[in-house]
Structure formats: C-alpha cells, structure tokens
Amino acid sequence: MSPGGERGEQSVTTATRAEVCVMACAEAWRGDGEILAAAMGTCSVLGARLARLTFEPGLLTTDGGALLTAEAIPLGAPAAADGAEGWLPFREHLWLVQNGRRHVMMGASQIDRHGNTNISVIGPWDRPKSQLLGSRGAPGNTICNPVSYWIPRQSPRVFVEKVDMVSGVGYDRARALGPSASRFHGLRRVVTDLGVFDFGTPDGAMRLVSVHPGVSVDEVIAATGFELATGTGEVPVTREPAGEELRLIREVLDPKSLRDREVKA
C-alpha cells in the first residue's frame, strides 16, 4: 500500500496514518479502568471506543450524547434501545468532571510547551482576529480531571510559544496557582497527525515520545513553534494497530472511513 493511497488501495495489514492516530489516541486511556472516556474529534472518539473493545474494557463510553452505551458502537450510530446501559444527564456529567472520574481528550487551537491551551480567541484580547468556541469546559477539565489532547494538523500556528488566551491550564500555571489547581491536574498525552507527546521533563514541558511511521523528527520540529524536548536517544516510531485492532477500526467502529477525512494519509 502506498501511504497516500485511497481506501480501496489499502493493504489488509498495513495501517494508514489515520489508523495510527486512532491507536495512539486509544493508548491515552490505557490503565484508566472504570472512568468516563470523553473524546472530541473523530480519531479520539474512535480511540476511546477501540480502547474499550481491547485493553480497557472497564471504560465508560457514550453515544456522543447523554446515553452510556453497553458496548462501543460505530461512529455516528445511535445507541439501540437495548444497547444503552445508563443515562448521563448534564448534572451527572458535571459531577464526574468535578470529582475526577472523567478522562477527556480535547482539541486545541493553540497549545504551548507547558500544555496551556487556547480555544477562545486568536489575536490580542482587546481586538482579536478570530473568536472561537470560548473557554467552555477547558478550565474545569484541566484542573479536575486527567486530560489529553488530539490535534489533527500540527503546525507552528497551533504549537505556539505563547497562547493568545489560556483556556486549558498547563503545568507551569497549575504550579503557580498552588495546590488548589495542581492537586488533580494531569496532562497525559498529546496526539497529532505527526507524533505523540507527553510532559515528562522535570519542568513539565512537552516532550516528543514517538513519531508516526513515515514522519521524521525534523518534520515534527519544523511543525512546532517552541523548543521541543526530544531526549538523547533515537525517538521511537508510534505503534501501528494490527490484526484485530485494524479489523475493529475498519469493520466495526468506522466502516465509513470517516477517520480518513480528519487525517489525510
């Protein structure tokens, strides 16, 4: 298979870039146990559902709305009447947020080296170029819950030296705010179309953990607008889904290949 091939040209056993991203997102929930997996974005939703179907069966997943599903369902499919195992109204969802029983994988319009994120405005606060979603749940999510990020298109415009507004709290700000902000604060991983990152340096700065197949470290650095820690040795290649994992992605969770619209090969 050519990495840039269409769905019909794919090898049965070789993963596309989008499928690698799904697998990398799934790994964010490894070891979480019985916790709500809240995901935003095609590949992150697929990742949460893949994790539940494979190595993390205790995860709680939803239909994208207020229903907890008895099992992971295909992307875009409603939970069948007999496939819902619970109702999760907004007040109960907020209880989970406030009590750390939710691992959310959010998106970010901007992210800096310490994991501060912006989903509110682009440009100066008093005269922004663009108005975005607003901070919404980002402050509470990052203070109260484990948080990861899924960014489909990494570039220096997204990976920035300083965010235009802080919506989600990073490690430097959590430390500065003290125990009330840092007690439950934890940024697990960042997954992009180029690689996987964590915040494993002594000062909680972003570190390159792996590059996706076919991507070089230099490409990742060129797509990053701040100094990125890469370690002293060779950067590993992100694990590809294989065998049953590929079958679940292609035949069970995303038979319409919606993942390929989010991440081009």
Residue ranges and their predicted role:
Residues 8-83:
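N-terminal active-site beta-alpha-beta segment that forms phosphate/nucleotide-binding
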